Amino acid sequence: MSSSTSQTTSRAGRLTLPVEKRMDAQVAELLERLQADAVRNSDGTELPEIVNKLATKIYQTYFVGRGDQDWAQTHPRELTRIYLMSERTPALADGELSIDLMTNWFVDQVYPDTDCDVERWWQVIDRTTGDVIAPGAWHVDPAGLSVTMDQAQAGHVYTVGFLAVQRWDPTQMYNYLTNGWADDPQRIKESPYDIRYPQTWQHVRHTLDQWLADNPQVDVVRFTTFFYHFTLVYGSDGTERFVDWFGYSASVSVPAMEAFEKRFGYPLQAEDFIDEGWYNSPFRVPRKSFRDWISFQHEFVTSRMAELVEQVHAAGREAMMFLGDNWIGTEPYGPHFAHTGIDAVSYTHLRAHE
Protein backbone atom coordinates (compact mmCIF):
# COMPACT_ATOMS: atom_id res chain seq x y z
CA MET A 1 0.00 0.00 0.00
CA SER A 2 1.41 3.37 -0.97
CA SER A 3 2.01 6.04 1.65
CA SER A 4 -0.57 8.33 0.02
CA THR A 5 -3.21 5.58 0.16
CA SER A 6 -2.34 4.87 3.77
CA GLN A 7 -2.73 8.53 4.66
CA THR A 8 -6.11 8.71 2.92
CA THR A 9 -7.35 5.61 4.73
CA SER A 10 -6.21 6.93 8.09
CA ARG A 11 -8.10 10.16 7.46
CA ALA A 12 -11.37 8.48 6.51
CA GLY A 13 -14.29 8.79 8.87
CA ARG A 14 -15.14 10.92 11.89
CA LEU A 15 -16.49 13.67 9.65
CA THR A 16 -20.12 14.56 9.05
CA LEU A 17 -20.94 16.54 5.92
CA PRO A 18 -23.98 18.87 6.03
CA VAL A 19 -25.86 18.57 2.73
CA GLU A 20 -29.12 19.71 1.17
CA LYS A 21 -31.18 19.31 -1.97
CA ARG A 22 -30.02 20.57 -5.37
CA MET A 23 -26.30 19.93 -4.77
CA ASP A 24 -25.91 16.30 -5.88
CA ALA A 25 -22.65 16.77 -7.78
CA GLN A 26 -21.08 18.72 -4.94
CA VAL A 27 -22.14 16.11 -2.37
CA ALA A 28 -20.44 13.25 -4.22
CA GLU A 29 -17.29 15.29 -4.84
CA LEU A 30 -17.00 16.53 -1.25
CA LEU A 31 -17.57 13.08 0.23
CA GLU A 32 -14.69 11.76 -1.84
CA ARG A 33 -12.36 14.68 -1.20
CA LEU A 34 -13.04 15.03 2.53
CA GLN A 35 -13.43 11.30 3.23
CA ALA A 36 -16.59 12.01 5.24
CA ASP A 37 -18.28 8.97 6.71
CA ALA A 38 -21.71 10.53 7.22
CA VAL A 39 -24.07 13.14 5.83
CA ARG A 40 -26.78 15.13 7.56
CA ASN A 41 -29.27 17.88 6.92
CA SER A 42 -29.65 21.07 8.96
CA ASP A 43 -32.48 23.18 10.31
CA GLY A 44 -34.53 24.28 7.32
CA THR A 45 -32.89 21.94 4.78
CA GLU A 46 -33.79 18.51 3.40
CA LEU A 47 -31.59 15.59 2.45
CA PRO A 48 -31.16 15.05 -1.32
CA GLU A 49 -32.26 11.71 -2.78
CA ILE A 50 -28.69 10.99 -3.86
CA VAL A 51 -27.68 10.19 -0.27
CA ASN A 52 -29.58 6.90 -0.52
CA LYS A 53 -27.11 5.79 -3.22
CA LEU A 54 -23.97 6.71 -1.31
CA ALA A 55 -22.08 4.23 0.84
CA THR A 56 -22.21 6.40 3.91
CA LYS A 57 -24.23 6.79 7.06
CA ILE A 58 -27.27 9.03 6.91
CA TYR A 59 -27.97 11.27 9.88
CA GLN A 60 -31.19 13.22 9.89
CA THR A 61 -32.06 16.15 12.08
CA TYR A 62 -35.08 15.53 14.27
CA PHE A 63 -36.93 18.16 16.29
CA VAL A 64 -38.86 16.92 19.29
CA GLY A 65 -40.41 20.13 20.57
CA ARG A 66 -41.33 21.87 17.33
CA GLY A 67 -42.04 21.21 13.68
CA ASP A 68 -45.70 20.22 13.90
CA GLN A 69 -47.34 23.62 13.60
CA ASP A 70 -50.82 22.13 13.34
CA TRP A 71 -50.34 20.65 16.81
CA ALA A 72 -48.95 23.90 18.17
CA GLN A 73 -51.83 25.95 16.83
CA THR A 74 -54.51 23.60 18.14
CA HIS A 75 -52.86 23.36 21.60
CA PRO A 76 -51.83 26.95 22.40
CA ARG A 77 -51.98 26.34 26.15
CA GLU A 78 -49.28 23.68 25.77
CA LEU A 79 -46.65 25.93 24.22
CA THR A 80 -43.47 26.52 26.20
CA ARG A 81 -43.26 29.43 28.63
CA ILE A 82 -40.54 31.80 29.79
CA TYR A 83 -40.27 34.22 32.69
CA LEU A 84 -39.59 37.83 31.70
CA MET A 85 -39.34 41.12 33.55
CA SER A 86 -40.81 44.43 32.49
CA GLU A 87 -38.67 47.53 32.25
CA ARG A 88 -37.94 49.19 35.58
CA THR A 89 -40.66 51.82 35.82
CA PRO A 90 -40.36 54.79 38.19
CA ALA A 91 -43.37 56.34 39.92
CA LEU A 92 -43.15 60.09 39.40
CA ALA A 93 -46.01 60.75 41.81
CA ASP A 94 -47.99 58.93 44.47
CA GLY A 95 -50.95 56.97 43.17
CA GLU A 96 -51.73 54.95 40.07
CA LEU A 97 -48.86 53.62 37.96
CA SER A 98 -49.12 51.72 34.67
CA ILE A 99 -46.28 49.36 33.75
CA ASP A 100 -46.00 48.23 30.14
CA LEU A 101 -45.02 44.57 29.90
CA MET A 102 -43.74 44.29 26.35
CA THR A 103 -41.54 47.36 26.10
CA ASN A 104 -38.26 46.21 24.50
CA TRP A 105 -39.43 42.61 24.07
CA PHE A 106 -40.02 41.07 20.62
CA VAL A 107 -43.76 40.60 20.17
CA ASP A 108 -43.25 38.10 17.35
CA GLN A 109 -41.50 35.79 19.81
CA VAL A 110 -43.28 36.18 23.17
CA TYR A 111 -46.47 37.55 24.70
CA PRO A 112 -47.84 37.67 28.28
CA ASP A 113 -49.60 34.54 29.48
CA THR A 114 -52.86 35.83 30.93
CA ASP A 115 -54.51 32.41 30.85
CA CYS A 116 -52.59 31.33 33.94
CA ASP A 117 -53.48 32.44 37.47
CA VAL A 118 -51.64 35.76 37.23
CA GLU A 119 -52.01 36.50 40.94
CA ARG A 120 -50.14 33.28 41.67
CA TRP A 121 -47.55 33.17 38.90
CA TRP A 122 -46.81 36.86 38.28
CA GLN A 123 -45.11 39.25 40.70
CA VAL A 124 -44.91 43.01 41.09
CA ILE A 125 -41.87 44.13 43.07
CA ASP A 126 -40.81 47.48 44.47
CA ARG A 127 -37.17 47.43 43.40
CA THR A 128 -36.38 50.38 45.65
CA THR A 129 -37.27 48.48 48.82
CA GLY A 130 -37.32 44.89 47.56
CA ASP A 131 -40.91 44.45 48.76
CA VAL A 132 -43.33 42.22 46.87
CA ILE A 133 -46.57 44.09 46.13
CA ALA A 134 -49.66 42.11 47.14
CA PRO A 135 -51.77 40.88 44.18
CA GLY A 136 -54.78 42.85 45.43
CA ALA A 137 -52.84 46.09 44.93
CA TRP A 138 -52.40 45.65 41.17
CA HIS A 139 -54.30 44.27 38.20
CA VAL A 140 -53.65 43.25 34.62
CA ASP A 141 -55.29 45.57 32.12
CA PRO A 142 -57.91 44.10 29.74
CA ALA A 143 -55.55 43.85 26.76
CA GLY A 144 -53.09 41.88 28.87
CA LEU A 145 -50.14 44.07 27.91
CA SER A 146 -49.76 46.19 31.04
CA VAL A 147 -50.19 46.08 34.80
CA THR A 148 -51.65 48.95 36.81
CA MET A 149 -50.74 49.57 40.43
CA ASP A 150 -53.21 51.41 42.63
CA GLN A 151 -50.88 53.05 45.14
CA ALA A 152 -47.34 53.46 43.88
CA GLN A 153 -44.97 55.61 45.91
CA ALA A 154 -43.28 58.58 44.29
CA GLY A 155 -39.59 57.98 43.67
CA HIS A 156 -39.87 54.21 43.86
CA VAL A 157 -39.08 51.91 40.93
CA TYR A 158 -41.30 48.93 40.11
CA THR A 159 -41.12 45.87 37.88
CA VAL A 160 -43.49 43.10 36.85
CA GLY A 161 -42.24 39.55 36.58
CA PHE A 162 -44.59 37.75 34.22
CA LEU A 163 -44.98 34.37 32.60
CA ALA A 164 -44.86 34.67 28.82
CA VAL A 165 -45.87 32.31 26.03
CA GLN A 166 -43.18 31.51 23.47
CA ARG A 167 -44.94 31.73 20.14
CA TRP A 168 -41.77 31.36 18.04
CA ASP A 169 -38.99 28.85 18.63
CA PRO A 170 -35.75 30.80 19.29
CA THR A 171 -33.48 28.78 16.99
CA GLN A 172 -35.96 28.68 14.13
CA MET A 173 -36.56 32.42 14.67
CA TYR A 174 -32.82 33.11 14.49
CA ASN A 175 -32.42 31.06 11.30
CA TYR A 176 -35.58 32.52 9.78
CA LEU A 177 -34.50 36.12 10.31
CA THR A 178 -30.82 35.58 9.53
CA ASN A 179 -31.46 33.68 6.29
CA GLY A 180 -34.32 35.86 5.07
CA TRP A 181 -36.82 33.02 5.05
CA ALA A 182 -39.67 35.53 5.00
CA ASP A 183 -39.12 35.65 1.23
CA ASP A 184 -39.99 31.95 0.96
CA PRO A 185 -43.78 31.40 1.11
CA GLN A 186 -43.23 27.74 2.08
CA ARG A 187 -41.49 28.70 5.32
CA ILE A 188 -43.66 28.94 8.42
CA LYS A 189 -42.83 30.26 11.86
CA GLU A 190 -42.65 27.29 14.23
CA SER A 191 -43.96 27.39 17.80
CA PRO A 192 -42.37 25.23 20.54
CA TYR A 193 -44.59 22.91 22.58
CA ASP A 194 -43.99 21.50 26.05
CA ILE A 195 -43.86 17.79 26.84
CA ARG A 196 -44.82 18.50 30.47
CA TYR A 197 -48.38 18.27 29.16
CA PRO A 198 -49.45 14.61 28.82
CA GLN A 199 -51.24 15.11 25.51
CA THR A 200 -48.21 16.73 23.93
CA TRP A 201 -45.88 14.06 25.30
CA GLN A 202 -47.99 11.26 23.82
CA HIS A 203 -48.15 13.15 20.54
CA VAL A 204 -44.36 13.48 20.48
CA ARG A 205 -43.90 9.75 21.09
CA HIS A 206 -46.43 8.76 18.43
CA THR A 207 -44.93 11.18 15.91
CA LEU A 208 -41.44 9.75 16.44
CA ASP A 209 -42.66 6.18 15.88
CA GLN A 210 -44.38 7.23 12.67
CA TRP A 211 -41.33 9.15 11.47
CA LEU A 212 -39.06 6.16 12.07
CA ALA A 213 -41.40 3.98 10.03
CA ASP A 214 -41.55 6.54 7.22
CA ASN A 215 -37.77 7.06 7.02
CA PRO A 216 -36.08 3.64 6.82
CA GLN A 217 -33.08 5.19 5.05
CA VAL A 218 -32.00 7.07 8.19
CA ASP A 219 -29.25 5.35 10.18
CA VAL A 220 -28.83 7.92 12.94
CA VAL A 221 -31.55 10.11 14.44
CA ARG A 222 -29.84 13.40 15.26
CA PHE A 223 -32.00 14.91 17.97
CA THR A 224 -31.67 18.70 17.79
CA THR A 225 -31.98 18.65 20.68
CA PHE A 226 -34.81 17.74 23.05
CA PHE A 227 -37.30 19.86 24.99
CA TYR A 228 -36.17 23.21 26.44
CA HIS A 229 -34.15 25.93 24.75
CA PHE A 230 -31.42 27.89 26.45
CA THR A 231 -32.49 31.45 27.23
CA LEU A 232 -32.56 33.41 23.98
CA VAL A 233 -34.94 36.36 23.84
CA TYR A 234 -35.06 39.10 21.24
CA GLY A 235 -35.67 42.78 21.83
CA SER A 236 -38.25 44.92 20.08
CA ASP A 237 -35.73 45.67 17.31
CA GLY A 238 -35.67 42.00 16.30
CA THR A 239 -32.14 41.33 17.56
CA GLU A 240 -30.77 39.43 20.54
CA ARG A 241 -31.56 41.13 23.84
CA PHE A 242 -30.73 38.42 26.37
CA VAL A 243 -28.80 35.21 25.73
CA ASP A 244 -27.63 32.67 28.29
CA TRP A 245 -26.30 29.36 26.96
CA PHE A 246 -26.99 27.79 30.37
CA GLY A 247 -30.25 29.66 31.01
CA TYR A 248 -33.22 27.84 32.49
CA SER A 249 -35.71 30.73 32.22
CA ALA A 250 -37.44 29.08 29.26
CA SER A 251 -37.90 25.70 30.94
CA VAL A 252 -40.84 26.79 33.08
CA SER A 253 -44.52 25.89 33.02
CA VAL A 254 -47.31 25.86 35.56
CA PRO A 255 -47.47 22.03 35.65
CA ALA A 256 -43.70 21.85 36.18
CA MET A 257 -43.73 24.40 38.99
CA GLU A 258 -46.64 22.63 40.67
CA ALA A 259 -44.78 19.31 40.43
CA PHE A 260 -41.70 21.01 41.84
CA GLU A 261 -43.62 22.17 44.91
CA LYS A 262 -44.87 18.64 45.57
CA ARG A 263 -41.34 17.29 45.22
CA PHE A 264 -39.40 19.87 47.23
CA GLY A 265 -42.06 21.10 49.62
CA TYR A 266 -41.91 24.80 48.83
CA PRO A 267 -43.43 26.98 46.09
CA LEU A 268 -41.55 28.85 43.40
CA GLN A 269 -42.16 32.50 42.59
CA ALA A 270 -41.50 34.54 39.47
CA GLU A 271 -38.49 36.12 41.17
CA ASP A 272 -36.83 32.72 41.52
CA PHE A 273 -36.35 32.84 37.74
CA ILE A 274 -36.10 36.58 37.14
CA ASP A 275 -33.44 37.14 39.80
CA GLU A 276 -33.63 40.96 39.78
CA GLY A 277 -33.33 40.89 36.00
CA TRP A 278 -30.20 38.73 35.92
CA TYR A 279 -32.21 35.58 35.10
CA ASN A 280 -29.80 33.40 37.12
CA SER A 281 -26.87 34.21 34.89
CA PRO A 282 -23.76 32.03 35.44
CA PHE A 283 -22.13 35.20 36.76
CA ARG A 284 -24.49 35.10 39.74
CA VAL A 285 -24.14 32.90 42.81
CA PRO A 286 -27.05 30.44 42.37
CA ARG A 287 -29.69 30.36 45.07
CA LYS A 288 -31.07 27.13 46.50
CA SER A 289 -34.31 27.40 44.53
CA PHE A 290 -32.42 27.66 41.25
CA ARG A 291 -30.12 24.75 42.07
CA ASP A 292 -33.16 22.67 43.01
CA TRP A 293 -34.85 23.63 39.73
CA ILE A 294 -31.83 22.54 37.69
CA SER A 295 -31.77 19.20 39.50
CA PHE A 296 -35.53 18.78 39.07
CA GLN A 297 -35.53 19.52 35.35
CA HIS A 298 -32.40 17.48 34.64
CA GLU A 299 -34.01 14.41 36.16
CA PHE A 300 -37.25 14.95 34.22
CA VAL A 301 -35.61 15.71 30.88
CA THR A 302 -33.20 12.77 30.99
CA SER A 303 -36.01 10.37 31.90
CA ARG A 304 -37.97 11.51 28.83
CA MET A 305 -34.83 11.40 26.70
CA ALA A 306 -34.35 7.76 27.68
CA GLU A 307 -37.85 6.89 26.49
CA LEU A 308 -37.29 8.46 23.07
CA VAL A 309 -33.86 6.85 22.71
CA GLU A 310 -35.45 3.50 23.51
CA GLN A 311 -37.93 4.05 20.68
CA VAL A 312 -35.08 4.77 18.28
CA HIS A 313 -33.16 1.69 19.35
CA ALA A 314 -36.27 -0.47 19.02
CA ALA A 315 -36.42 0.64 15.38
CA GLY A 316 -32.83 -0.49 14.84
CA ARG A 317 -31.31 3.00 14.62
CA GLU A 318 -28.74 4.99 16.55
CA ALA A 319 -29.62 8.09 18.56
CA MET A 320 -27.37 11.14 18.59
CA MET A 321 -27.85 14.39 20.49
CA PHE A 322 -26.72 17.79 19.24
CA LEU A 323 -25.27 19.69 22.19
CA GLY A 324 -27.04 23.00 21.69
CA ASP A 325 -30.39 24.69 21.05
CA ASN A 326 -32.93 22.76 23.16
CA TRP A 327 -30.27 21.21 25.38
CA ILE A 328 -31.41 22.50 28.79
CA GLY A 329 -31.72 19.58 31.17
CA THR A 330 -29.65 17.26 28.97
CA GLU A 331 -26.25 18.27 30.36
CA PRO A 332 -23.79 15.38 29.79
CA TYR A 333 -22.07 16.26 33.06
CA GLY A 334 -25.35 15.83 34.97
CA PRO A 335 -25.84 12.84 37.27
CA HIS A 336 -28.67 11.28 35.24
CA PHE A 337 -27.27 11.65 31.72
CA ALA A 338 -25.55 8.26 31.76
CA HIS A 339 -28.94 6.57 32.00
CA THR A 340 -30.34 8.10 28.78
CA GLY A 341 -28.83 5.46 26.49
CA ILE A 342 -27.84 8.08 23.91
CA ASP A 343 -25.24 6.73 21.47
CA ALA A 344 -23.37 9.93 20.67
CA VAL A 345 -23.19 13.65 21.32
CA SER A 346 -22.28 16.10 18.57
CA TYR A 347 -21.15 19.68 18.88
CA THR A 348 -20.40 21.79 15.82
CA HIS A 349 -19.87 25.34 17.03
CA LEU A 350 -16.59 26.67 15.63
CA ARG A 351 -15.65 23.18 14.47
CA ALA A 352 -15.82 21.29 11.19
CA HIS A 353 -16.40 17.87 12.69
CA GLU A 354 -18.85 15.91 14.82
Could you tell me what each predicted segment is?
Residues 45, 64, 225-227, 323-327, ...:
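Active-site-proximal loop/turn and secondary-structure-junction residues that shape catalytic pockets
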Residues 348-354:
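Conserved small/polar residues in nucleotide/adenosyl-binding loops
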Residues 248-296:
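Active-site-proximal, well-structured secondary-structure segments within enzyme catalytic domains
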Residues 198-206, 293-307:
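Aromatic- and glycine-enriched glycan-recognition loops and surfaces
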Residues 17-18, 222, 297-331:
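Aromatic-lined carbohydrate-recognition surfaces of secreted/lumenal glycan-active proteins
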Residues 215-230, 277-291:
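Active-site groove signature of glycoside hydrolases
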Residues 39-41, 223, 347:
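Conserved beta-strand positions
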Residues 1-209, 214:
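Mature N-terminal, pre-catalytic/accessory segment of carbohydrate-active enzymes
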